[in-house]
Amino acid sequence: ELKLPIVGRDEDPQYGLAFDLLSSAMEQVFTGHEDGLITLDLAEGDDVHREQLRVEMDEPYRTLLGHFRHEVGHYYFYRLIGTNADYLQRFNDLFGDPDADYQEALDRHYSEGAPPGWKQNYVSSYATMHPAEDWAETFAHYLHIRDTLDTAAAFSFAPANATFDRKQLGP
């Protein structure tokens, strides 16, 4: 429905989409994205574990599905935006430089928190951390909104034939 290309490892062994579904119950797991590989911590499916992390990270909410949406956003940045000079310039204009020092931004975010007034321009406090995270958080929130509309349509709370016609992006 979104007309986004899904390129797997079978088609692109280096950057195709793949998943590592691991559990921090057995080993340390970091949710993240690298070169098309999305790693998710299945232990976050446990309510108590996830809630402990949510409180520790000072997040208003935290879900495994939210992490999935967020990391898929990183994948689509590299698949669609990072490979197109025009899209990359538009990204820079809207979100900032995706090549800004990530570790520096991460350290600043966890030591200082989100800047005052962040709610005026960002979908989450984490989005303030770095342009790449702003994109991924925005993408995740968009998918969340779309899922909500699809659910509403399935229960006749919205027009079932509503479409969001757009030009297909990507190669």
Predicted segment positions?
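Short pre-active-site segment immediately N-terminal to the catalytic Zn-binding motif
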Residues: 48-68
